[in-house]
Amino acid sequence: MRVSKYLLSTQKETPANAEVISHQLMLRAGMIRRNASGLYSYLPSGLRVLRKVEAIVREEMNKAGAIEILMPMVQPADLWVETGRWDKFGPELLRFKDRHNRDFVLGPTHEEVITDLIRKEVSSYKQLPLNLYQIQTKFRDEVRPRFGVMRSREFLMKDAYSFHLDMDTLNETYEAMYQAYSNILSRMGLAFRPVLADTGSIGGSMSHEFHVLAQSGEDLIAYSTGSDYAANIEKAESPMPTETRGAATKELRLVDTPNAKTIAELVEQFGLDITKTVKTLIVKGATEEAPLVALIVRGDHELNEIKADKLDLVASPLEFAPEALIRDAIGAGPGSLGPVGLNMPIIIDHSVSVMSDFAAGANVDDKHYFGINWERDLPLAQAADIRNVVEGEPTPDGLGTYAMARGIEVGHIFQLGTNYSKSMNATVLDENGKSQVLLMGCYGVGVSRIVAAAIEQNFDDRGIVWPEAIAPFSVGILPMNMHKSHRVTDIAEQLYKDLSAAGIDVLLDDRKERPGVMFADMELIGIPHTVVIGDRNIDAGVFEYKNRRTGEKQDVPFDQIVDFLKNLQA
């Protein structure tokens, strides 16, 4: 490709409304342009990257035995009513009526459509297992789209769905998809971690997320220093306390604490050990008999809302009680709450169950109890794992301790079980002629999200540093003063032909531009390899080669340059 015949829309200035580096660089490098909130057009360079990501995804899915199909983005509402998600999904589901007043949605996901398709097409166990995938545009009406294509309303996704008669074949397909996803991200040259994950709104049992590691990642990953164990912070298991509860050594005291509204203020003003304090959080209950529930964690720990949401006594989705409701029920506000004398179900974290002589709110404004002890001052409450893990704690496999990293979720695989097939009556006849509800798996990759995540992991102060496999072009040719030197023009043109003939994606900058502008554009758009041609190089019979990632330069003889560049891509 020649720059003179290409839409290379680079920008010097960083757009003011771009928050994260991938959004900034995709705009500056001329990869995307915003059409509306959360909606983007892909310009040529952006589309080239997107298509390369898509090609790798497709190749690995095909290798894993999945079969490609294509389903409509527009879906009939009656399928969503059938599974109950018409009411459950919320405003992210964009709904509309056609000219015949029939309800439709723009698909954020395709479980309903694929299950409907399979229940009509598959009738015998002999047709199973079956793994179908598509690469299709999705739409979620995010309340606040942000971060460019990282969290846009319209996005490109690969979603696969597998169908099984037994858990053995579901497990086999799940493992195949796990490996395929690992292969996809490895081939793209990205540092990543698969992690245990919560199944979220899609539901199911087993679930893993695939995270591209980046300091800007929204997700916190807890992983073991001594094994492959890794989990999203929402899913990471807290260790059970190894110590036993100590004997009471202090009397229960009611203390005035007028200026201590937070744990930090309480600890600072009274010289307390933060591990001897607790936080009490009031949430909505799941039953009329218990409309409010108290959740208690140690003062230095944080409540894990995903874990709390799964408690039987707690309403789902988790909802914190408003202050007015808390005051009406307890007589005190947040900052002064505690377990002593609290007339509602109490669930404590396991770490709280072994505490003694601890401090908590007294359920009276501006007062706390010091020296609280279980069984002496109140009954020991129900205990559960309801907190986030902490760095340095032992991991569940016993092979290391927790360390933390930030990641960007780009893939998610689920074992759905019968969540959708049962509600939609997707069944087949087994070998005995009996009707069996299909088991399902679901496997998603954010194709457009990978593009942004790759940039978040691969950039410097000059622009994008693309991994070889997904760069828009592999090689950039920079002829110095091309329009003033016939020698430079002739050699640049010949090199362009030779590299193109060798199957290398090459961009020839044939503009009448200053060298500084040409170099800046090549570095901004992130081309991995640059070849500079000038009269001095020609006199010496060499090209000047520069590596975008390392910055290293070297001279390469004319007759060796094609093989040299091909070897770099091998």
From Swiss-Prot:
Catalysis performed (reactions): tRNA(Pro) + L-proline + ATP = L-prolyl-tRNA(Pro) + AMP + diphosphate
Function in brief: Catalyzes the attachment of proline to tRNA(Pro) in a two-step reaction: proline is first activated by ATP to form Pro-AMP and then transferred to the acceptor end of tRNA(Pro). As ProRS can inadvertently accommodate and process non-cognate amino acids such as alanine and cysteine, to avoid such errors it has two additional distinct editing activities against alanine. One activity is designated as 'pretransfer' editing and involves the tRNA(Pro)-independent hydrolysis of activated Ala-AMP.
Pfam families in the cross-refs: HGTP_anticodon, tRNA-synt_2b, tRNA_edit
EC numbers: 6.1.1.15
UniProt cross-references to PANTHER family, sorted A to Z: MITOCHONDRIAL RIBOSOME PROTEIN L39/PROLYL-TRNA LIGASE FAMILY MEMBER, PROLINE--TRNA LIGASE
Protein name: Proline--tRNA ligase
Record bears the keyword ATP-binding: yes
GO cellular component: cytosol
Species whose genome carries this gene: Shewanella oneidensis (strain ATCC 700550 / JCM 31522 / CIP 106686 / LMG 19005 / NCIMB 14063 / MR-1)
